[in-house]
């Protein structure tokens, strides 16, 4: 019977979560969904000084916004300390691990001497038990670290789903500390126990973890576990070609939401940031899940391109349901000082203005003209466009608009043409002053569409001002 696929996302809550981080959640999530398996969220919070609940909340918020649902968790490593300590004790009892009393000063001196001899700095196994070996007496009052007895000789081999076959000689690996003097377990050890207990079958993570993998495999095998399939993703680079990070100016995932990006655009963009399905650039969440596989993960670093993301977001804004968009745009309009209630139906306004917008914020900036409370026209613009010679044309326009049997865009456009023909004017001569009077600004979408949305009463009232 084939084992059920189980993947995990295991972030450390030590800062905000950026696009590179969330991509490491998206791929295992998509693979679990594709394989009808389970996606587990594990919070690796053993760095107590740097971890925070606020950072955990941001992770959960980002995943919820992107609709990356979890099947199990979140599990917190700090709540599993008893389990880790029990496994450490078991390993010592089974002689898979041992206490080491070498002080930090002794270890530093050892490494410095090794460097001076041109050797790789490493623990030399002073306290490692061996047949016939006499160990030094434990120093009084010193709490030891616990080290894993890494295999001697041979190598660790795994077929990485991204990088291919990787082989690391055990001679390159010293005996890893798995528990500190106070008994707290170390990162690499906790990861192994978690992956074993949670029956993780596929570990899809950043390639900064490649060096941890041989150590984790050796510990897992010592505990009787079977190593999962590993897929180490190449780094995501920022615009400058540096590794994406907060230090190098990366924005939090929730920052994209607050800037007016749609979750489906972010998911589509991240899916292509290290994976491909032929030449497909735009695809739905359902298509992504259907197509996703480990074989087509990229082997080279992917570079973030904000213009590409903006282009995708524009596509999804244009395709989105107008009622849904209206609900998303409303807070942006209100943040700009607009009052949506009492104005034109926002979904209709969104339908008019959304096509040229790259973000919801840009939709709001254009839509704001329908919801401004202050319609004061700048004197310079009034002097330029609201001249005495144009007033009769505005009055004629208002009279004909007031007589329209139906307030429709096409009929409004026909009235404009009629007035323009009667006065021998071109459209800007009449449209600009009308824009100023009705919208308070010169830049608007098509004037007939704008007047239709404002409604007859508002338009006639403002033209009479």
From Swiss-Prot:
Positions contributing to ATP binding: 246
Catalyzed reactions: tRNA(Glu) + L-glutamate + ATP = L-glutamyl-tRNA(Glu) + AMP + diphosphate
Lineage: superkingdom: Bacteria
Location of this chain's protein in the cell: Cytoplasm
Cytoplasm listed as a keyword: yes
Region (Disordered): 118-139
EC assignment: 6.1.1.17
GO CC entries: cytosol
GO molecular function terms listed in the Swiss-Prot or TrEMBL record: ATP binding; glutamate-tRNA ligase activity; tRNA binding; zinc ion binding
Catalytic class of the enzyme: ligase
Sequence motif: 'KMSKS' region, positions: 243-247
Major location (coarse): cytoplasm
InterPro entries hit by this protein: aa-tRNA-synth_I_cd-bd (IPR045462), aa-tRNA-synth_I_codon-bd_sub2 (IPR020751), aa-tRNA-synth_I_CS (IPR001412), aa_tRNA-synth_I_cd-bd_sf (IPR008925), Glu-tRNA-ligase_bac/mito (IPR004527), Glu-tRNA-synth_I_codon-bd_sub1 (IPR020752), Glu/Gln-tRNA-synth (IPR000924), Glu/Gln-tRNA-synth_Ib_cat-dom (IPR020058)
Keywords, in A-Z order: Aminoacyl-tRNA synthetase, ATP-binding, Cytoplasm, Ligase, Nucleotide-binding, Protein biosynthesis
Disulfide bond in keyword set: no
A biological-process GO annotation: glutamyl-tRNA aminoacylation
Assembly, per entry: Monomer.
Similarity comment: Belongs to the class-I aminoacyl-tRNA synthetase family. Glutamate--tRNA ligase type 1 subfamily.
Function: Catalyzes the attachment of glutamate to tRNA(Glu) in a two-step reaction: glutamate is first activated by ATP to form Glu-AMP and then transferred to the acceptor end of tRNA(Glu).
Protein name: Glutamate--tRNA ligase
Gene name of the encoded protein: gltX
């Amino acid at each position: 019977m084939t084992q059920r696929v189980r993947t995990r996302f295991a972030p450390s809550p030590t800062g905000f979560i950026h696009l590179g981080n969330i991509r490491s959640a998206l791929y295992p999530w998509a693979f679990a969904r594709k394989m009808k398996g389970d996606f587990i969220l594990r919070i690796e919070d053993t760095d107590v000084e740097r971890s925070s609940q606020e950072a955990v909340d941001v992770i959960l918020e980002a995943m919820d916004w992107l609709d990356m649902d979890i099947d199990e968790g979140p599990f917190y490593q700090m709540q599993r300390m008893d389990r880790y300590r029990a496994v450490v004790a078991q390993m010592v009892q089974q002689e898979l691990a041992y206490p080491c009393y070498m002080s930090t000063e002794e270890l530093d001196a050892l490494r410095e001497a090794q460097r001076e001899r041109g050797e790789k700095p490493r623990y030399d196994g002073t306290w490692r038990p061996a047949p016939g070996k006499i160990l030094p007496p434990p120093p009084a009052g010193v709490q030891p670290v616990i080290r894993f007895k890494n295999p001697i000789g041979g190598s660790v081999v795994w077929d990485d789903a991204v990088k291919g076959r990787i082989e690391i000689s055990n001679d390159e690996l010293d005996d890893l500390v798995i528990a500190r003097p106070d008994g707290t377990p170390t990162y690499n050890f906790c990861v192994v126990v978690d992956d074993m207990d949670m029956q993780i079958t596929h570990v899809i993570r950043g390639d900064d973890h490649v060096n941890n993998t041989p150590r984790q495999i050796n510990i897992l095998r010592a505990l009787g576990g079977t190593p999962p399939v590993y897929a180490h993703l190449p780094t995501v680079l920022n615009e400058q070609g540096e590794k994406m990070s907060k230090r190098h100016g990366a924005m939090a995932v929730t920052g994209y939401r607050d800037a007016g990006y749609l979750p489906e655009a972010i998911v589509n963009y991240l899916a292509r940031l290290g994976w491909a399905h032929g030449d497909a650039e735009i695809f739905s969440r359902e298509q992504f899940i259907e197509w996703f596989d480990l074989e087509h993960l990229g082997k080279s670093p992917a570079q973030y391109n904000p213009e590409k993301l903006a282009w995708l977001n524009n596509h999804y804004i244009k395709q989105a349901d107008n009622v849904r968009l209206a609900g998303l745009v409303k807070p942006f309009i209100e943040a700009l000082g607009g009052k949506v209630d009492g104005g034109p139906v926002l979904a209709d306004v969104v339908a008019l203005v959304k096509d040229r917008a790259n973000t919801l914020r840009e939709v709001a900036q254009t839509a704001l003209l329908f919801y401004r409370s202050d319609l004061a026209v700048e004197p310079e613009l009034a002097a330029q466009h609201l001249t005495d010679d144009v007033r009769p044309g505005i009055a004629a326009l208002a009279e004909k608009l007031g007589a329209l049997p139906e307030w429709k865009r096409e009929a409004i456009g026909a009235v404009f043409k009629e007035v323009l023909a009667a006065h021998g004017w071109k459209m800007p001569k009449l449209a600009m002053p009308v824009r100023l009077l009705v919208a308070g600004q010169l830049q608007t979408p098509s004037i007939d569409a704008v007047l239709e949305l404002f409604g007859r009463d508002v338009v006639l009232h403002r033209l009479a001002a």
